[in-house]
A protein has these predicted regions:
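Short hydrophobic/aromatic-rich beta-strand motifs
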Residues: 36-38, 45-50, 85-89, 220-224, ...
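Outer-membrane beta-barrel transmembrane strand signature
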Residues: 215-229
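Acidic, glycine-rich loop-and-strand cores that form catalytic or ligand-binding grooves
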Residues: 150-218
């Protein structure tokens, strides 16, 4: 069989270049056939070449889409998606009075091959309610999970485990990466920040001039953060923030 070698092929618009039977076409030193893909700088810019064992094609670098769950629901695998990176964070614990703040939810992350999976149920843990005084113990946040693959428990509320203490952070499990959420602050004479999670810490704290600062701004905090405490006993702390499940989708 003979070879035709060229570094450039030109054809008029709408025309076809025919290679005679018995000849191979070599473009830039590479023989082209039904399993070869000539590079197109304009169409394939920013992509990489991937093979499924039968044929090769150009694909995008990085995730092609992201599914975010701020409430529980079902993730359905989009057509052509083969792998995902899943991130889960548990709900934050609520703040109590006297600066005893809630802890952040734990965090887990995992790479999952989803070629044999059609759907997975995602559970998003709620943020817990806040309290006042020593006896108004902030509740613990809820657990977030991606099916049975990975999960992250919620942070505990201020004054929940021991009196005068901040909450204990939640913990991720089942992932390639599993970490604790940040703990809450203990008793003091001003507001204590809510525990910091993977996405950041609780809302602002303040002194006596703005006693309701934490409560009034409790939604201005990232997912999974612990609730900032109230100033002194009678002022209610901030609720813990709900968790989240984030699915980054790759071809």
């Amino acid at each position: 069989m003979s070879n035709v070698y060229t570094n450039e092929l030109d054809a008029a618009s709408g025309q076809t270049i025919l290679i005679p039977s018995g000849y191979n076409l070599s473009l830039g030193g590479t023989i082209l056939n039904e399993n070869s893909i000539p590079p197109d700088p304009e169409e394939e810019n920013g992509k990489y070449l991937v093979s499924d064992g039968t044929s090769a094609s150009f694909k995008h670098i990085g995730p092609t889409s992201i599914s975010t769950f701020y409430g529980s629901g079902t993730w359905t695998r989009p057509e052509g998606i083969n792998r995902v990176i899943v991130r889960v964070i548990g709900g934050g614990g609520g703040g109590s009075g006297h600066a005893e703040s809630g802890a952040a939810g734990g965090y887990a992350e995992e790479v999952i091959d989803v070629r044999g999976i059609s759907s997975v149920y995602c559970t998003v843990g709620n943020g817990s309610q806040s309290g006042t005084y020593y006896s108004g113990n902030g509740d613990g946040g809820g657990t977030s999970s991606f099916g049975n693959y990975l999960s992250a428990s919620g942070g505990l509320g201020g004054n929940q485990t021991y009196q005068h203490c901040g909450g204990l952070g939640g913990l991720g499990s089942g992932g390639n990466l599993n970490i604790y959420g940040g703990g809450g602050t203990g008793h003091m004479n001003y507001m204590g920040f809510g525990g910091g999670g993977f996405f950041g810490s609780g809302t602002l704290s303040a002194h006596g001039n703005w006693n309701q600062g934490a409560r009034s701004n409790q939604l201005k905090a990232p997912r999974g953060a612990g609730g900032t405490s109230g100033y002194q006993g009678s002022y209610q702390g901030a609720n813990g923030m709900a968790g989240a499940v984030i699915v980054m989708e790759f071809v």
